[in-house]
A protein has these predicted regions:
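The feature marks the mature, well-folded catalytic cores of soluble enzymes
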Residues: 1-178
Length: 178
């Protein structure tokens, strides 16, 4: 409003804006993704693969081994930049003797990064990354290869579900920058 040289919003208009911000309305949901969780996960995987992502469904104990195997199958270096994320710290990376991990933000020389995802969207096969101290956004953008760890429980039907989860985790007035 300031850039338009308009005064402060007042009266009913201000009340309407405040009410909408206090209780954001939920947008429309896509019917194809309103499924039981196992089918949501399958739909997410189908869409992700359609969009040329490589998907491997493994148990939590097998994540480090699968990451190492993926790198070997694709002739990628076993040196990875990893997000300093509590999600990723829960895995036994030390069991992978050939894997060299540097934790922190992405750098121009990084060829491979490993991060956790905030959510996966079943209706589109999209991963949602929430930037912050435990997930530097540079890890999403700089390396040529980005390995994303997504828990099945974090796959949601659609974008509207992600907005709700973001508000739950970060609060209404503090969202991740990216």
């Amino acid at each position: 409003r300031r850039s338009l040289r308009r005064g402060e919003l007042a009266g009913e208009a201000r009340s309407a804006v405040e009410a909408r911000l206090a209780s954001p309305p939920r947008g429309p949901s896509v019917a194809r993704a309103q499924l039981p969780q196992p089918e949501k996960v399958a739909l997410f995987c189908q869409w992700a693969e359609t969009l040329n992502a490589t998907v491997a469904r493994v148990g939590a104990d097998d994540v480090p081994g699968e990451v190492t195997a993926y790198l070997a199958r694709n002739n990628l270096p076993a040196n990875v930049a990893m997000a300093p994320s509590p999600l990723l710290e829960g895995y036994d990376w030390a069991s992978q003797k050939m894997l060299s991990i540097r934790r922190g933000r992405g750098e121009g020389s990084d060829q491979v990064s490993v991060t956790g995802a905030f959510a996966g969207i079943a209706e589109t096969g999209t991963v949602v990354m929430a930037s912050g101290p435990d997930h530097p956004v540079s890890l999403n953008l700089l390396p040529d290869t980005h390995v994303v760890v997504l828990r099945e429980a974090d796959v949601v039907a659609g974008y509207e579900d992600v907005w709700g989860r973001l508000r739950e985790r970060y609060g209404k007035n503090l969202m991740p920058r990216t």
